[in-house]
UniProtKB/Swiss-Prot annotation:
Cofactor binding description: Binds 1 divalent metal cation per subunit. Most active with Zn(2+) and Mn(2+) ions. The physiological cofactor is most likely Ca(2+) or Mg(2+).
UniProt name for this protein: Regucalcin
Pathway(s) served: Cofactor biosynthesis; L-ascorbate biosynthesis via UDP-alpha-D-glucuronate pathway; L-ascorbate from UDP-alpha-D-glucuronate: step 3/4
GO cellular component: cytoplasm; nucleus
Species of provenance: Gallus gallus (Chicken)
Keyword flag Aminoacyl-tRNA synthetase: no
GO biological process, one term: intracellular calcium ion homeostasis
Its biological purpose: Gluconolactonase with low activity towards other sugar lactones, including gulonolactone and galactonolactone. Catalyzes a key step in ascorbic acid (vitamin C) biosynthesis. Can also hydrolyze diisopropyl phosphorofluoridate and phenylacetate (in vitro). Calcium-binding protein. Modulates Ca(2+) signaling, and Ca(2+)-dependent cellular processes and enzyme activities.
Active site positions: 204 (proton donor/acceptor)
Cofactor names: Zn(2+); Mn(2+); Ca(2+); Mg(2+)
Family: Belongs to the SMP-30/CGR1 family.
UniProt-annotated binding residues for substrate: 101, 103, 121
Reaction catalysed by this enzyme: D-glucono-1,5-lactone + H2O = D-gluconate + H(+)
Length: 299
């Protein structure tokens, strides 16, 4: 077992850091600060962070095949031109739910952008239940609604054979699997593959490695856990120096580094003084496994 090393990269501290995505072309890590309403890009070579402010809570960012990015902000799917600092709405959802916003999102192997909604939180993890839905933005810019009654739509990824969709609705304290059809993007036959233990707290963002194992960031659990979706067993736990770990992705050279985002919202002064890196982005090396490159949105 190689020795695991954890370091905080960049000096920025986010209120609700989320949605880390590696941009190989730019040798950079993208992420968002949902409540801080900004999309951030950390340059791995220079260590510099560029931030782009937006007009609503921005909950996920993804690469786009034609260049630049797509984001979810408020209840909108939007295109983001980085250099021009230009945001253009592509589609809107949940028009009948003024208190909703998007949460986590990710692009599937066919280039569709999956993202889910939730009610705006009163305080972290406290909100009106079952207000959210899971959506897909297709490359032709049409939107498909998969299901509703979601509490906090969160982590998502696809199996290496593209036959299973993994998904987290945080307050179910479960990592779920669906049968997934790559051709149509349809999902069905939902089942739980892992139930979180008490000390793991709330499942948040998620990614998959090249061995088909899932990595889940545990909000208020201060850790990422590695799960085997076949056996339903936890294989590994990596603890971080902050409690509010929110999401994870692989990146860097050969996708052998893991990046973990975190939050500081909901922490009082005393808590923050104990965890000065809360809201930071962490790089984990020495895990001995690699991830797969993110898929770009095809539209």
């Amino acid at each position: 077992m190689s020795s695991v090393k954890i370091e905080c990269v960049g000096s920025d501290r986010y209120r609700l850091g989320e949605s880390p995505v590696w941009d190989e072309k730019e040798n950079s890590l993208l992420c968002v600060d949902i409540t801080g309403r900004k999309v951030c890009r950390w340059d791995a070579a220079s260590g510099q962070v560029q931030a782009l402010s937006v007009d609503a809570p921005v909950s996920s960012v993804a690469l786009r095949k034609s260049g630049d990015y797509v984001i979810t902000l408020g209840t909108r799917f939007a295109a983001l031109k980085w250099k021009e600092q230009l945001v253009t709405t592509i589609a809107q959802v949940d028009r009948d739910k003024a208190n909703n916003r998007f949460n986590d999102g990710k692009v599937d192997p066919a280039g569709r952008y999956f993202a889910g909604t939730m009610a705006e939180e009163i305080r972290p993890a406290v909100l009106e239940r079952r207000q959210g839905s899971l959506y897909t933005l297709c490359p032709d810019h049409s939107v498909v609604k998969h299901f509703d009654q979601v509490d906090i739509s969160n982590g998502l990824d696809w199996s290496l054979d593209h036959k299973t969709f993994f998904y987290i609705d945080s307050l179910s304290y479960s990592v779920d699997a669906f049968d997934y059809d790559l051709q149509t993007g349809k999902i069905g036959n939902r089942r739980s593959v892992y139930k979180l233990e008490k000390e793991e707290s709330i499942p948040d963002g998620m990614c998959i490695d090249t061995e088909g194992k899932l990595w889940v960031a545990c909000y208020d659990g201060g850790r990422v856990i590695r799960l085997d979706p076949e056996t339903g067993k936890r294989i590994q736990t990596v603890k971080l120096p902050v409690d509010k770990t929110t999401s994870c992705c692989f990146g860097g050279k050969d996708y052998s580094e893991m990046y973990v985002t975190s939050a500081s919202d909901g922490m009082d002064r005393e808590w923050l003084s104990r965890q000065p890196q809360a809201g930071g982005v962490f790089k984990i090396t020495g895990l001995g496994v690699k991830g797969i490159p993110p898929y770009p949105f095809a539209g």
